[in-house]
């Protein structure tokens, strides 16, 4: 009976985790938004529709997996937007570089019409650190060479800090992979930023991980 109850509780916990991630899951834009035509549209469509056979065929035909589309996005980043772990792994196994920046407008059509629009400049690891993603995405990217200390991009630490459910797990893992907690592009290390907003529990947690409040 105890075994049955334990299994039921484990199942409930797993279901709850899935609900949390589904709640925050972004609907990926349709392929043509960032991959308007040609071979890049074919590849993005295969990713969007989760067609690994079509993706393998295009890889075999020589598609450049590190191509940045006319809309400013890599195939790997687009697979991440689709929450497609298996496709990401397929791309990485065949040479996709997780450290290439994607630089794209939030709404390209608005930008084309002359309206003001935010431009994103990010790597896959930075985006995978956010609350929308299970830690397995970060682990996959790091396994295939994602740089936890990339100084050309906003670091993954900032997304992890905003993840109230799994942020600490992500931060601990990043530190285990060599993350420099004391570096910041803005000059304000994460621990100081958390102190400024009175997040003392997080300050103590970062200190336990090795962050230096005097850095």
Predicted regions and their residues:
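Ankyrin-repeat intra-repeat helix-capping/turn positions
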Residues: 50, 83, 132-133, 164-166, ...
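Ankyrin-repeat boundary/"N-cap" motif
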Residues: 33-45, 68-77, 101-129, 150-162, ...
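Conserved ankyrin/ankyrin-like repeat signature
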Residues: 54, 86-87, 136-137, 166-170, ...
């Amino acid at each position: 009976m105890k075994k049955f109850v334990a299994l039921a509780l484990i199942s409930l916990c797993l279901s709850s985790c899935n609900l949390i991630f589904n709640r925050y899951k972004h609907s990926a834009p349709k392929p043509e938004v960032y991959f308007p035509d040609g071979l890049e549209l074919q590849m993005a469509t295969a990713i969007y529709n989760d067609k690994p056979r079509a993706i393998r065929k295009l890889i075999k035909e020589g598609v450049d997996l590190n191509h940045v589309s006319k809309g400013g996005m890599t195939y790997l980043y687009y697979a991440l937007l689709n929450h497609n772990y298996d496709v990401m792994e397929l791309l990485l196994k065949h040479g996709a570089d997780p450290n290439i920046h994607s630089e794209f407008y939030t709404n390209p059509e608005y930008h084309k019409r002359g309206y003001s629009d935010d431009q994103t400049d990010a790597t896959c690891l930075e985006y995978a650190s956010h609350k929308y993603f299970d830690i397995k995405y970060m682990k996959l990217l790091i396994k295939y060479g994602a740089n936890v200390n990339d100084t050309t991009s906003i670091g993954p630490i900032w997304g992890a800090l905003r993840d109230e459910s799994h942020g600490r797990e992500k931060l601990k893992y990043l530190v285990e992979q060599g993350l420099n907690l004391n570096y910041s592009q803005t000059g304000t290390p994460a621990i100081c930023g958390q102190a400024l907003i009175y997040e003392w529990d997080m300050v103590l947690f970062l200190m336990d991980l090795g962050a230096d409040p005097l850095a």
